[in-house]
Structure formats: C-alpha cells, structure tokens
Amino acid sequence: MSSKSHLPYAIRATNHPNPLTSKLFSIAEEKKTNVTVSADVTTSAELLDLADRLGPYIAVLKTHIDILTDLTPSTLSSLQSLATKHNFLIFEDRKFIDIGNTVQKQYHGGALRISEWAHIINCAILPGEGIVEALAQTTKSPDFKDANQRGLLILAEMTSKGSLATGEYTARSVEYARKYKGFVMGFVSTRALSEVLPEQKEESEDFVVFTTGVNLSDKGDKLGQQYQTPGSAVGRGADFIIAGRGIYKADDPVEAVQRYREEGWKAYEKRVGL
C-alpha cells in the first residue's frame, strides 16, 4: 500500500499539499465514509434524486454526464447545489483520451463545461504524457476558476476482464502522476501503486487510490466486469471505493449505500488500526 495509507484520513488531510485531496480526506473523516457512488443513470431527475438521497452517506458522486438524455444547465447547477448541501465532491468519469489540444477544449469549454462543475476528472494515458500535461496546463488559464479545487485521477488499471491497462502502461501512469503531482491527485486502480518504479518515489508521496467495481453481492457481469468487496478493495490499498449498480439498482438505494459505507469504513479502520 502507499506509504501513507496506514495513516488516518484526518492526518493525511492535515499534511497533504494538494488542497482538493486535503478536502477529500476531510470530507471522508467528517462523514465517516469512503464511498463513491457511480450514478450511471440516464435522466437528470434520476441523477439529482440519487444525489440528494445518497449525498449524506458518500464522499464523492461519480457521473457520466454525457449519458443523460435531458442534460441542461439547470441539471448542473442543481447538482452543484446538492454537492454543497451534502458536502461531497463531483467526479466526472470522462476518461479523457486524445491529443492535448483536444482534451483542453473538452475539459474547459465545449457543451459540457466540465471544468466549471466537476471537482475531479480522469484520463487514460494512451496518448502519452501530453494528455496529462495539457490538462494540468488548462488549470493555469487566466479564465480558469477554482483551480485549487480541481484534480485529475489517472486511469492506471481497470477491473474489466482482459484489461490492457497493465505492466508498462501502469508504470507510465505512476511516472506521469509524479511529474504532475500538483494537479494529479492519484489513480483509479485495483490496488495501491506505491511500489511501482520505487526508485522514483519521494518519501512525502501520498496519491489517492480509487477502486472501481466494488459490489457486496455479485462476482461480475456478462460484459466482463469483475467485482470485489469493500473489504478486499480497501485491503488492497483503495482509499475510496466506487460502487454503482450494487447501490443505485438496489430495492432501497439508501439502505444499500449505508451498508457499503459501514463495510468500507470498517475495512478502513482495520487498515489504519483504529
């Protein structure tokens, strides 16, 4: 696990140099939750309803805003209001993957205006280092607001069967994160990555690990998704667990998110010795 993963969120929040990461750990500590809900719904009403009902129990709400069939500016302003009301961060799972000039326009501009409302974004590094550099540069634009409350996760590994995000790809993900650590918060991965390229690691390094595919009941789906439990994910180094269908498709999503919160927090306390 990361050199800091044995420490409580409160300590990591206090010592972390990245303002957004510090805020994220503070939210987790205050709300006693490490749950990220992946709200993969297709209407604004469903998204806002989930955000309002589940908001008190989560640290982060993950969106795929481009699958909404009725997206309007009102949807985004309402989502921001709910994030403030319930104290959670918004993670737009856009998975940027293009040349630098294009991703800059996709992030800061275009129809979705992602930089204006999403605290966290992510990217794949198949295009090379330039995609990370370009996204980091965008936050330095004169018209970019709230730059210290924006951050990037690099998609270093995936939980789908047969994923090619392994080996050299994962190593380069860690290398680029270290180079652009002012904007890169950490990784979406199946484990902590602190032992990748250990010769480059600084003692103060503290990247956040988000792990997808967390589900209390299913082993996987027909499309190659492979699940792990909150306990196994946190045990492998996840700081924040991402759960989707196991929560929003449950008969009672509020009851479900509380179970994930309880299991995730129990695993976290075991890891840090509380």
UniProtKB/Swiss-Prot annotation:
Catalytic residues, chain numbering: 95
One of the record's GO cellular component terms: cytosol
Keywords per UniProt: Decarboxylase, Lyase, Pyrimidine biosynthesis
Organism from which the protein derives: Emericella nidulans (strain FGSC A4 / ATCC 38163 / CBS 112.46 / NRRL 194 / M139) (Aspergillus nidulans)
EC number in record: 4.1.1.23
Binding site for substrate: 40, 62-64, 93-102, 227, 245
CDD domains: OMP_decarboxylase_like
NCBIfam families: pyrF
Keyword Ubl conjugation: no
Name of the protein described by the UniProt record: Orotidine 5'-phosphate decarboxylase
GO terms of biological process kind: 'de novo' pyrimidine nucleobase biosynthetic process; 'de novo' UMP biosynthetic process; sporocarp development involved in sexual reproduction
InterPro entries with a match to the protein in the record: Aldolase_TIM (IPR013785), OMPdecase (IPR014732), OMPdecase_AS (IPR018089), OMPdeCOase_dom (IPR001754), RibuloseP-bd_barrel (IPR011060)
PROSITE patterns: OMPDECASE
Family: Belongs to the OMP decarboxylase family.
GO MF terms held by the record: orotidine-5'-phosphate decarboxylase activity
Pfam families, alphabetized: OMPdecase (PF00215)
DNA damage recorded as keyword: no
Catalytic reactions on record: orotidine 5'-phosphate + H(+) = UMP + CO2
Pathway(s): Pyrimidine metabolism; UMP biosynthesis via de novo pathway; UMP from orotate: step 2/2
